[in-house]
């Protein structure tokens, strides 16, 4: 358990797997979280939870999601699960409460705005646990792709498409980009013309 939850620089990393990308119609089927320190060292892994849904819900997914979630094993885990959205939210909030105070961490991950939209609708208490800011690794990836393609191309994800593996990938990807950010001179202010 955390010795002091107030005023820390810990980061909450999260990933969701969903039945699709439509935040009004689709649903969260898996959630995982990791807490790191500011230097991206893993402090704790939260519960990795498949959320119960009926077979009809899974069969209604598009082909990509059906194939991916069967291949990863998530399909069967969802069918076998007894965990509801409310239980997954409560377990995740309880875990986070041991490591970081509410409102202290931005929501961290890849394409995290999409996760935030799903959380707002289906797990609003958990969504409110985060600071309003996001630490979205995909923003850095998009900038690197345009400004430093060799840096962007130097990282390969595992692409397992499970929530926990995707959280780990996000942390590792930011570690990759951080190597190149050191070339900026740390805390040294940069001169900007204009």
Swiss-Prot record:
SS bonds (residue pairs): none
Organism domain of life: Bacteria
EC number, as in UniProt: 3.1.15.-
GO molecular function annotation: 3'-5'-RNA exonuclease activity; nucleic acid binding
Keyword Hydrolase: yes
Subcellular localization(s) per the UniProt record: Cytoplasm
Pfam families: RNase_T
Keyword entries, A-Z: Cytoplasm, Exonuclease, Hydrolase, Nuclease
Active site: residue positions: 132
GO biological process: DNA metabolic process
Family per record: Belongs to the oligoribonuclease family.
Role of this protein: 3'-to-5' exoribonuclease specific for small oligoribonucleotides.
Name this polypeptide is given: Oligoribonuclease
Organism annotation: Xanthomonas oryzae pv. oryzae (strain KACC10331 / KXO85)
Phylogenetic classification of the source organism: Bacteria, Pseudomonadati, Pseudomonadota, Gammaproteobacteria, Lysobacterales
Gene: orn
């Amino acid at each position: 358990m955390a010795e002091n939850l107030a005023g820390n620089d810990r980061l909450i990393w999260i990933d969701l797997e969903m039945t699709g990308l439509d935040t009004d119609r689709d649903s969260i089927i898996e959630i995982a979280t990791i807490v790191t320190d500011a230097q991206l060292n893993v402090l704790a892994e939260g519960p990795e939870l498949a959320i119960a849904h009926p077979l009809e819900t899974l069969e209604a997914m598009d082909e990509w999601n059906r194939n991916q979630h069967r291949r990863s094993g998530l399909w069967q885990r969802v069918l076998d699960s007894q965990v509801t959205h409310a239980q997954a939210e409560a377990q995740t909030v309880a875990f986070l409460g041991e490591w970081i105070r509410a409102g202290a961490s931005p929501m961290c991950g890849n394409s995290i705005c999409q996760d935030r939209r799903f959380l707002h609708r289906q797990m609003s208490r958990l969504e409110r646990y985060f600071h309003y800011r996001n630490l979205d690794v995909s923003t850095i990836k998009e900038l690197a792709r345009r400004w430093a393609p060799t840096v962007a191309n130097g990282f390969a994800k595992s692409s397992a498409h499970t929530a926990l593996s995707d959280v780990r990938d996000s942390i590792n990807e930011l570690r990759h980009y951080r190597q190149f950010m050191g070339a900026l001179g740390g805390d040294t202010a940069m001169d900007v013309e204009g």
